[in-house]
């Protein structure tokens, strides 16, 4: 099956352009005919530097702020936190620049017909096709997964001369030169880029010989013809097909001479030639994309007959829901490969695609949900090696997080808060906030524990003992060490204080709005899971460092509580939310993505269901797919599907809207504005609806909606080291094949029955095969 996005006109704005990438180079291609723009990104182009931005003040008086909280003097606690604990903003992810490709036709008044642009998800290729003046034109563009260059081939079916002008531009001051039929520019990123919501006199600040150094090198490769240098770029004249090679590089990794580095890469790419570059790219990309295949629905030629906008509108009406949901699933896999290929940086708020110097929320790593949601799909969707980009970020954050723990808390271990950046900055931000309430998002020292969950998940899916011992264990151990020190006694329990439920606020008994309290349900859920995970690791690795202390602390954490409406309480006390429909459903972490609330916890599951119904079925793009996964965990496929359907709401707005979530014409998730987490979360929700696994127990179709009557999936992963293929019709599974990494027993639940199987290491086994299910 060929999965593609296809359109009948060029992009008019960024949210209509189509994304290409290889984890390091990102490109948004407009698909223009006479005027093409390719907006570029490099995964390591950020503001700031490795150096600490500001010195730490004296250690805050944590006993004082805890006293204020326990005495319900919340306003005073928040004021103290803002003035003594919060610090400067993180660095910002930045755009590199733009390639302009102009077709200089002799008669610009010719009618353009049979226009089509496509993004092949199977091949990671962008193509544009049109006819003008009796000549057929085609542009084929890819960002090589193997040779680390962007390549665009321009071809026609005519022997007539083609005249094309190519130029580069950037929003940052740069030095541009033309040499040896090439365009080269160099620049330095700003040392400071303020968030777009922070107003100041100098939001973008440069410092001579400071900031990340970066460059772009572009070269047309011709069989025949001429390349003319001019003030604005290069003008190409040729009667043959030709292609353009582009390479970008920063000195983030310590590269001493980025120009020499790019020149070597470009020469190597030119030597290989277009055919070899494309073949190498396809082989590498297919090694990721072809691991898994999902097909749902009845129509095999649906995507050939209709364009993407038509498909989206049909889905909104409840038509062809299986096919379009499957397309969005594969699009998420495509975006993961393109933005988080092993060896590159972790996908940020916008993956690797950003065209603004002051992007929404600095396009950083927001780790109170968004970054984590990016990777919920990674393991189950057979892209566990793409997950490793996040682990590299975690390793850098651990180093800074140890300093934060020591200087800000006076504790051992490591900690991070709701924002981090490429440098691993782990401090709570918001010191200079102008909204008056930064604590509701900033005073949350729990992301380090949540990030640990991802390392444990990687082990659960891969059973990689070396990874657990050498990589995950030290990180998780030091996080546990911090939280053991951070917990404090209250009411016979060990609680977090101060504590928030990310970005949400509550009303106290006087009806006043606050965010800072103690023992939020999310905090406690995360710590219950972290401590239980650490104890499991101790048993697996036969180590006992902090084991007794962790066992004691786990038992002393407060229990979950059920509130006034039967809902799972969001805070230790039964406060009312200021916004009952708030986008964050943080108190349900223990249900999903966590596994603290078990299948057998019927009372708590009912409380979670009530909480979800109270929150409603609308919200931001990422919020709706989180709720879909929560409903899937509750085995309610119809509710999960309702949320996915609500998320497919075509929008063009890029203004912040906390309840207007949807998707853009290029299928990017709209918060709005664009955030890529909703794309990845959509795939995670579908994965959870099709297969759930815990402790060598696999359930197939646990939350399948009525609309998805027929389908098959190959290559989906389950915890315990299993790879599963299965097919279904009318909600009933009729074929199952499982392969196992390690020897052991597994329970498989399907069609209301339970089967048990034993596997030898590396064994493949057909567990169910029924005929007559065509």
What is the role of each PLM region?
Residues 346-364, 489-503, 667, 700-711:
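Short, surface-exposed recognition loops and adjoining beta-strand edges that mediate ligand/DNA contacts
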Residues 319, 361-365, 378, 435-446, ...:
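Alpha-helix capping and helix-loop boundary segments enriched in small/acidic/polar residues
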Residues 456-462, 467, 472, 479-489, ...:
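Non-catalytic carbohydrate-binding regions of carbohydrate-active enzymes
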